[in-house]
């Protein structure tokens, strides 16, 4: 499994957590029954756990940049994509441009026709206001 596939699974797990409220351990268990994450296991679990741990802060940031589009009206998959990308940019060591590009690609694959541009615009505004450089990784 490569990092792009792992990121897709992070989004799927965050989506499942959001809609089912299953404990994270059960979500991981279900995933490992059918998939071998290989060397991506640490990234997957760390990103899912970290996103859930910082969910309130991440959701506040998403609401701030969503321009009159409350979280409860967003497609749940878009919310999972945004949460994953914001977590990576705030707490991960992933270059900003990669995180945004992958978020847009996941949206193209799993969400509505309007979602990629919405996600790109929201994440772009977040990066500009936070002063994050397009290509740099966060030092947190």
UniProtKB/Swiss-Prot annotation:
GO biological process, alphabetically ordered: DNA-templated transcription termination; transcription antitermination
InterPro entries: NusB-like_sf, NusB_fam, NusB_RsmB_TIM44
Keyword Transcription (UniProt): yes
GO CC terms in record: cytosol
Family matches, as Gene3D superfamilies: NusB-like
Keywords: RNA-binding, Transcription, Transcription antitermination, Transcription regulation
Key word Protein biosynthesis present: no
Superkingdom: Bacteria
One Pfam family this sequence matches: NusB
Residue pairs linked by disulfide bridges in the UniProt entry: none
Molecular-function GO terms, alphabetical: RNA binding
Described function: Involved in transcription antitermination. Required for transcription of ribosomal RNA (rRNA) genes. Binds specifically to the boxA antiterminator sequence of the ribosomal RNA (rrn) operons.
Homology family: Belongs to the NusB family.
UniProt name for this protein: Transcription antitermination protein NusB
Organism expressing this protein natively: Caldanaerobacter subterraneus subsp. tengcongensis (strain DSM 15242 / JCM 11007 / NBRC 100824 / MB4) (Thermoanaerobacter tengcongensis)
